[in-house]
Regions:
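N-terminal secretory signal peptides
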Residues: 1-26, 34-42, 46-49
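Pepsin/retropepsin-fold aspartyl endopeptidases
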Residues: 33-34, 38, 43, 52-55, ...
Length: 452
């Protein structure tokens, strides 16, 4: 999920899921995130925005032309090895595709140019935690001003996200308003967890955390719509979903100021950090979650199954540590970068900025405004009905969507990916399909019907 596209925020999603604010930094720091806020990253020596061979590397990046942007940044660095923006952005291009040596090389180059640059430090910290190099991430989180994250990841001993088991097929207990599956926490009885790729870490209710014997290694007080909420972060020994068990897992939970649970719709939420350690199929049509150890053999089977189903691989990009992106189209836009949000809740199949809806001539019902929240601030969206929205060969026609006139097309770091967004796809779109996220080969597969 991209930061401006969270449609409905409940206190449960905000605090327990650690994602309702659209960007986890605001919750961990307890800072209010204002829609459209932008941080201007410093450029070494006041260098201008990256230009190469008459083409604008930054414009290529914003447009989602990442390979071309990467080459353009490299050309800049050949001429000017001290260009911080080019080094950092070239590292970011590598990070989007989980090309870790590439990302580390250029982000380390940027770090040497400007050791105190918060954006560089945050990107490099993200690069390390994706590889489970938690200890290396700690000084980078500190330099990025993320003291809570620094304390959290410094608390780990041994290998995080240890995988036991090879495959699990976990049936959904319900589809709506959000999917629920059963999971065991520290060997305890089954608990009801939802899942959402718009959320980062595994999180759970304070009651479940207490039952599991968790203790906090970091905490933060925040104010959500006038309600004081305490966020806690710790280390979970065991999280089991069917035949797959994860050990030594980062986990968060929350309480009201009086110590009570924040919402009771479920017992917790599984975020993208868990899923990028596995090869996961979200089998909407079959109402099940298929989790696999990410081996070459498992990936080969997924590719073969997708080929038989006629599903071509789509690119997968991961921005801001947990926001999944791929390519899709809306109302004849042509192939563009879109957000892909699996799980969660909501009635709209996609959400898009108002400027995009007008640009594409999408029928919008301005007589029926929807008053909701974004970044914990009031906003108003409107129903809209694009003639077609598409992810690969997965298509929905005249389906209910929403548009937000206040949403910006591009939100820079730290509150956005810096990528021009056309739309984000949500829970209702996926219902006729099964969708697989392969974070090793960085592909998305979406096929009609139940997974085989």
């Amino acid at each position: 999920m991209v930061p401006w596209l969270r449609k409905v925020i409940t206190k449960r999603e905000k605090a327990v899921a650690d994602e309702g604010q659209w960007d986890r930094r605001s919750l961990l720091r307890g800072a209010a995130v204002v829609a459209g806020a932008a941080a201007a990253a410093p450029l070494l020596g006041g260098a201008a925005r990256a230009q190469a061979g008459g083409g604008d590397a930054d414009a290529l990046f914003k447009a989602g032309k990442f390979e071309q942007a990467g080459r353009a940044y490299e050309e800049i660095l050949k001429k000017d090895p001290t260009n911080l923006n080019a080094a950092r952005q070239r590292g970011y291009v590598g990070l989007l595709s989980n090309k870790f040596p590439d990302a580390e090389k250029h982000l380390t180059m940027a770090l040497k140019l400007a050791p105190d640059d918060k954006e560089t430090n945050a990107l490099l910290a993200d690069c390390y935690i994706r590889q489970d190099k938690f200890s290396l991430s700690v000084p980078r989180w500190q330099a990025a001003g993320e003291d809570g994250y620094a304390k959290w990841f410094a608390a780990f001993r041994g290998e995080p996200y240890q995988i036991h088991g090879d495959i699990a097929r976990v049936p959904w207990q319900q589809m709506d308003p959000s999917p629920l599956v059963e999971a065991s926490v520290n060997g305890g009885p089954p608990k009801r967890f939802t899942f959402y790729t718009g959320a980062p870490n595994l999180s759970m209710s304070a009651t479940v955390a207490k039952e599991a014997g968790l203790h906090a290694v970091a905490s933060q007080k925040t104010d959500f719509e006038g309600t004081i909420i305490w966020m806690y972060y710790g280390v979970l020994d065991s999280f089991k979903l069917g035949g797959i068990e994860l050990r030594n897992v980062p986990v968060g939970w929350s309480t009201t100021e009086s110590g009570g649970d924040v919402g009771t719709d479920n017992d917790g939420l599984i975020g993208t950090w868990v899923f990028y350690h596995l090869l996961t199929t979200f089998d909407y049509a079959g109402r099940s979650l298929i989790l696999r150890r990410p081996t070459p053999e498992a990936a080969s089977k997924v590719r073969a199954d997708a080929k038989r189903a006629g599903a071509k691989p789509l690119p997968l990009w991961l921005a801001l540590d947990h926001y999944v992106h791929s390519t899709g189209s809306i109302a004849g836009s042509g192939t563009q970068v879109v957000g892909v949000n699996v799980g969660g809740t909501g009635e709209s199949a996609a959400v898009m900025p108002g400027e995009r809806a007008k640009q594409l001539g999408i029928r919008t019902d301005y007589d029926r405004p929807l008053e909701t929240f974004g970044h914990s601030h009031a906003t108003t969206t409107y129903p809209c009905y694009p003639k077609e929205i598409r992810l690969g060969d997965a298509v929905a026609k005249e389906i209910y969507c929403e548009t937000d006139p206040n949403a910006r097309i591009n939100v820079p770091w730290p509150y956005g990916s810096g990528i021009d967004m056309w739309a984000a796809f949500f829970h209702p779109f996926h219902k006729p399909y099964n969708i697989t996220l392969d974070f090793t080969n960085m592909n998305v597969y979406i096929a009609r019907g139940k997974a085989t």
